[in-house]
Amino acid sequence: MDEALIPKGVKRTSPAKFLLWTLPWLGLLAWGGVSALLCLLLGLNQTNMSNIFAFALWIVFDLAVIALGAGAFFTGFLTYIIGKKELKDIINATVIIGFICYSGAVAMLGIDIGQPIRGWFIFWHANVHSMLTEVSFCITAYLAVLGIEYLPIILENRKLQEIREFRLFGHNLHHIMAVFAATGVFLSFFHQGSLGGMFGVMYARPFAARWEFYIWPTTFFLFVFSAIAAGPCFTILCTKLTEAISRKKLVPDGTIQLLAKISGWLLASYLVLKIIDTMGWLQGIVPSAGLTFSDFFREGPYGAWLLFLEIIVCGIIPAVILMIPQARQNEKWLILACLLNCTGIVLNRFNFIVVTLAIPVMPFARFWSYLPTWQEWGIALAVIGYGMLLFSVSYRYLPLFPRERELNAANMQRIWQPF
């Protein structure tokens, strides 16, 4: 039925099986749609957000997917600026992953602000003293850049290639993609950093506050570093998941190994800076606030084990695996390392958002915990459903992996696949 739309020389499953594959993701979108409608019609009282937790599950998801989507700008930087041409075998996938992450985050923010029809106030009545203003501008601009980078991939569709104007336009866009890659690096550096800097300047909350390096708190640089360390691992996970489901080889091992190696060394470098920053915080910010480390975890469900889990289990262990060639060449160890790395960055964002707000700032105040409502989970999980749908449709109808045909030439007649 849709054979004319499928890339030439590759096999895809039947439309019926593909539709069956999309049903759970459509279900998540439906859940999210009902949740969003309730939040827009009845207000944010549908959530458990309050004056204590002005930031909650949605912001954790936002910061996590924005960090995991950093594989798009960083891989673009390596491919078009540094000249790692072997990464062209995976660059299309990273662009789509980045687009999914950023568009999903922006959609979630549209509900989070409570009155999305006033979202333009962020730009028209900009608070130039707020890091969130810079974040809003850069995220919106970078989403536009990702849309432009996604466009030539769409125009490579087999049917669209028959239209001469589309074919030439897409071809010309490819020639200037380095300009958009450089623009994306610039925009991403500042909004990734400002998301961290926003917490570093919360001086009334010693758990998050950090010393400044020139005009930026150290969290500015740590958020950038952690994003570029985890982003490539998320790209690897998405690629390996697609290979497992489609039962095809989609990307050469050399490309995956290069990304894993770079990610491992970046993660190790980030951990060195993170540990130095944490020790400086323990010796400086904490005692200057009249506190000790144990005071932050005196009560409540959030313990020091979260920091141990983030730095040791989800930091040092995957860094070691990714830096050792024999370890990362084992697919099971590679996937474990990438999972731990991505989990670590989610934990990092959770610690800075939820744990920071759960710790009282007054000696007579209590410790808090946060439990999201089903509406909050619905909107957050809808982003996952949206991402799975868009990536599945892109894989089915676009040449997402340029060497798929070459890598599977001998196996074109086998296997069932949901795409």
Q: Which residues are covered by each model-predicted region?
A:
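N-terminal signal-anchor module of multipass membrane proteins
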Residues: 1-71, 75-78, 359, 388, ...
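Peri-membrane helix termini and adjoining interfacial loops of integral membrane proteins
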Residues: 42-46, 117-121, 202-206, 283-291, ...
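Hydrophobic alpha-helical transmembrane segments of integral membrane proteins
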Residues: 102-117, 183-189, 268-270, 346-361, ...
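TerminUS-proximal long segments
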Residues: 330-419
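Secondary-structure capping and boundary motifs in well-ordered enzyme cores
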Residues: 34, 50, 63-66, 92-99, ...
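Alpha-helical transmembrane segments
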Residues: 76-77, 149-150, 319-322, 390-395
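Transmembrane-helix bundle segments that line or gate the permeation/cavity pathway
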Residues: 39-58, 64-162, 177-196
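Long, contiguous internal "core" modules enriched in hydrophobic/ aromatic residues
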Residues: 8-10, 15-16, 22-36, 84-86, ...
